[in-house]
Amino acid sequence: MLVASTAARPMDMIIRGCQVIIQQYRSGQTEAFYQRMLQIHLYHSGIVCLAEVDVFAMSGAVPVLVGRIDLEVDHSTILELKVCNQILPKHVQQLLRYVRARQATGMNVQHAAVICFTDSNTVIVREEDLRPPQPPAKGVVRSRFFPPPN
């Protein structure tokens, strides 16, 4: 049996879980319902998941609440769940604000996504891959320019 890389596996399970939830329960549920169902799906899949994680920024020595992450998955993925017809720029900005705040605390955020459960029984996922670009394989040169011979 082939296993996907550990970085890709949680996101694959998240998307699969959203599909199962929307097929089984359809639209018209609350954000809290979808959040809890996804949390249960991930639990049964063996993936660590925390709900409603407070996110802070520091103002000197004083912590200031930035907001609450809907789901933090596998200590590397941040999810913001919405019940609406489309993902708006403000939803993405909210997600990225949480990502920056968590990265400032030392969390290695590799993925972040806004997941939108729509009225038309579909799920829209806007995923941000936050992993740093991989260096080229050993012995591979990206580009190198040499002066012409004299």
Question: Residue ranges of each PLM-predicted region?
Answer:
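Interdomain/boundary linker segments immediately adjacent to catalytic/signaling cores
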Residues: 1-27
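Conserved beta3 VAIK motif of the Hanks protein kinase fold
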Residues: 79
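Nucleic-acid nuclease catalytic cores
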Residues: 82-136
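Active-site metal-binding core of divalent-cation-utilizing nuclease and nuclease-like domains
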Residues: 23-75, 119-124, 128-133
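Non-catalytic C-terminal interaction segments of nucleic acid-processing enzymes
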Residues: 1-10, 137-150
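Histidine- and/or cysteine-centered catalytic micro-motif in compact active-site loops
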Residues: 19, 54, 84
